[in-house]
């Protein structure tokens, strides 16, 4: 079982915690991680982009000049793609970019992402993450003390508006709850900062 030290918000070590070998000590499957990140990003796309083809642009119903005798190239409409104000040839149309992943693969991807953070030493367990009021300074001080000044994902056992809003204005910092963590956010963060209570919740729900 992986053993990780526990620190307080001042960065001082206050103990250690044994993590689930299934969740935090799994073999990292890079192929599944790639598939999970790709699915996550593709599923964020709305797919509503659209352009007008020659049949959808207004006007152009009349042949601009007669077929023969003018010396000019034959044209059937002023809305052909080669014309100014003409329709778009092969332009984007609305489509569904959604990619499905089965539950087992999602679970393997999550285990791999969490295990990769532990292996790299980028998982930081804090005994308790809390703020007395909306204090960005408190969160900034904590992140600096524990060595997570840059991109950090803070995971809580439940929604805490004081913590969420205190961290909201810190660049590169995202706050979430244990049951909404995803592979992309975990891998995108330099440090995975999680409270001791949130670790217990993760092991309870995802084991």
Regions found by a protein language model. Name each.
Residues 54-91:
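Glycine/serine-rich anion-binding loops at beta->alpha junctions
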Residues 46-49, 55:
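Short, structured surface segments that line ligand/substrate-binding pockets
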Residues 1-46, 91-207:
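Extended polybasic, low-complexity segments that bind anionic RNA or targeting/receptor surfaces
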């Amino acid at each position: 079982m992986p053993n990780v030290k526990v620190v307080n918000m001042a960065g001082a070590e206050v103990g250690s915690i044994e993590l689930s070998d299934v969740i935090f000590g799994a073999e990292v499957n890079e192929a599944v991680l790639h598939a999970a990140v790709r699915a996550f990003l593709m599923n964020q796309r709305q797919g509503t982009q659209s352009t007008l083809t020659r049949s959808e642009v207004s006007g152009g119903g009349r042949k601009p000049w007669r077929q023969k005798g003018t010396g000019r190239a034959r044209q059937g409409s002023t809305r052909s793609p080669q014309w100014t104000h003409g329709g778009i040839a092969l332009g984007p149309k609305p489509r569904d970019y959604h990619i499905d992943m089965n539950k087992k693969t999602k679970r393997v991807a999550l285990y791999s992402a969490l295990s990769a953070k532990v292996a790299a030493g980028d998982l930081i367990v804090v005994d308790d993450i809390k703020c007395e009021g909306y204090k960005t300074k408190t969160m900034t001080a904590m992140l600096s003390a524990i060595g997570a000044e840059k991109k950090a994902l803070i995971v809580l056992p439940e929604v805490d508006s004081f913590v969420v809003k205190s961290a909201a204005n810190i660049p590169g910092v995202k706050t979430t709850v244990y049951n909404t963590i995803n592979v992309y956010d975990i891998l995108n963060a330099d440090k995975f900062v999680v409270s001791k209570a949130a670790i217990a919740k993760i092991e309870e729900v995802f084991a």
